[in-house]
UniProtKB/Swiss-Prot annotation:
Its EC number is 3.1.3.16. It comes from Rattus norvegicus (Rat). This is Protein phosphatase 1A. Its cofactor is Mg(2+); Mn(2+). It is found in: Nucleus; Cytoplasm, Cytosol; Membrane. GO terms for biological process: cellular response to transforming growth factor beta stimulus; N-terminal protein myristoylation; negative regulation of BMP signaling pathway; negative regulation of canonical NF-kappaB signal transduction; negative regulation of non-canonical NF-kappaB signal transduction; negative regulation of transforming growth factor beta receptor signaling pathway; positive regulation of canonical Wnt signaling pathway; positive regulation of DNA-templated transcription. Enzyme with a broad specificity. Negatively regulates TGF-beta signaling through dephosphorylating SMAD2 and SMAD3, resulting in their dissociation from SMAD4, nuclear export of the SMADs and termination of the TGF-beta-mediated signaling. Dephosphorylates PRKAA1 and PRKAA2. Plays an important role in the termination of TNF-alpha-mediated NF-kappa-B activation through dephosphorylating and inactivating IKBKB/IKKB. The lineage of its organism: Eukaryota, Metazoa, Chordata, Craniata, Vertebrata.
Length: 382
């Protein structure tokens, strides 16, 4: 927890799929962290009469990956199989769903605690969870921790989840009522989130219920009625993404990428790469879920993208030639470009989103460069 590599691991895990009128893509990268502690779930078509429902979630583990991995495999079952979710006969009501989600979180947390104790060595890992449960009529946003989800509707951020931070007044009050404190914006000066699954060292205050502990496993659940005409896409991501991109920035960037490609894996990869180049030092995971009215590929946008790439290619050549003797390093090239007013850069991503294009041209013109120097310089680009 908190340890970093000498250079980032940039290999990605990808997946994509479609069904129920939805398309999704996902990407995850270990980045600078010593371990990959993120996990994710993507299920289109749920069992037990919920074939028209879908579930997606991102889990950001800390102090180990055990809780995140267990949740990605079992949280959905705990949600849909409890009696609060099922309710009476027929499709579950909105309140059934919201109550069932909450019950599912509390049940899986208690189940993991009992399992950990039986192994005679309490697991100290924990995980945030952000997800969406999508029915034909509603989208249920689920959040526990500081990962975040947002809905882009009619080209704007319509909704986003609130991060559960110890400095939040309501969270701080609960922490203090449980005998804890908030120091340097952390629970007891240590944990940066005030709600999470796992983290059982923070859930052992006698006389307090599970939602009254220093760290609570209770999710916030918001139901949003779907709008076939206006709903465009949903983004779920861990804080490795949000640390360097704001809600509107990421919404604008994703929308611009959807206008030049319909490959959702590629869009997610561009998000992850861009955040790495913007300075994210954490694991990074993102899921993009597109509704039928998501932005479509535009011939005009594709043309502008090609023109931008050609412009950058020419500028890299000019910068290298201007150097004269010897070839400037990639950091110098990036800093030079960053000082210029380059037209038509992707909104939200800006020059960082074009790092791969620039580096490809640089490598072609400088085939004898030292791969161990420039390729790892993502933390000092300009």
């Amino acid at each position: 927890m908190g340890a970093f590599l000498d250079k980032p691991k940039m290999e990605k895990h990808n997946a994509q799929g479609q069904g129920n009128g939805l398309r999704y893509g996902l990407s995850s990268m270990q980045g600078w962290r010593v371990e990959m502690e993120d996990a994710h779930t993507a299920v289109i078509g749920l069992p037990s009469g919920l074939e028209t429902w879908s579930f997606f979630a991102v889990y950001d583990g800390h102090a180990g990956s055990q809780v995140a991995k267990y949740c990605c495999e079992h949280l959905l079952d705990h949600i849909t199989n409890n009696q609060d979710f099922k309710g009476s006969a027929g499709a579950p009501s909105v309140e059934n769903v919201k109550n069932g989600i909450r019950t599912g979180f509390l049940e899986i947390d208690e189940h993991m605690r009992v399992m950990s104790e039986k192994k005679h060595g309490a697991d100290r890992s924990g995980s945030t969870a952000v997800g969406v449960l999508i029915s034909p009529q509603h989208t249920y946003f689920i959040n526990c921790g500081d990962s975040r989800g947002l809905l882009c509707r009619n080209r704007k951020v319509h909704f986003f989840t609130q991060d559960h931070k110890p400095s939040n007044p309501l969270e701080k009050e609960r922490i203090q009522n449980a005998g804890g404190s908030v120091m340097i914006q952390r629970v007891n000066g240590s944990l940066a989130v005030s709600r999470a699954l796992g983290d059982f060292d923070y859930k052992c205050v006698h006389g307090k219920g599970p939602t009254e502990q220093l760290v609570s496993p209770e999710p916030e659940v918001h139901d949003i009625e779907r709008s076939e005409e206006d709903d465009q896409f949903i983004i779920l991501a861990c804080d490795g993404i949000w640390d360097v991109m704001g809600n509107e920035e990421l919404c604008d960037f994703v929308r611009s990428r959807l206008e030049v490609t319909d490959d959702l894996e590629k869009v997610c990869n561009e998000v992850v790469d861009t955040c790495l180049y913007k300075g994210s030092r954490d694991n990074m995971s993102v899921i993009l879920i597109c509704f039928p009215n998501a932005p479509k590929v535009s011939a005009e946008a594709v043309k502008k993208e090609a023109e931008l790439d050609k412009y950058l290619e020419n500028r890299v050549e000019e910068i290298i030639k201007k150097q004269g003797e010897g070839v400037p390093d990639l950091v110098h090239v990036m800093r030079t470009l960053a000082s210029e007013n380059i037209p038509s850069l992707p909104p939200g991503g800006e020059l960082a989103s074009k790092r791969n294009v620039i580096e490809a041209v640089y490598n072609r013109l400088n085939p004898y460069k030292n791969d161990d120097t420039d390729s790892a310089s993502t933390d000092d680009m300009w």
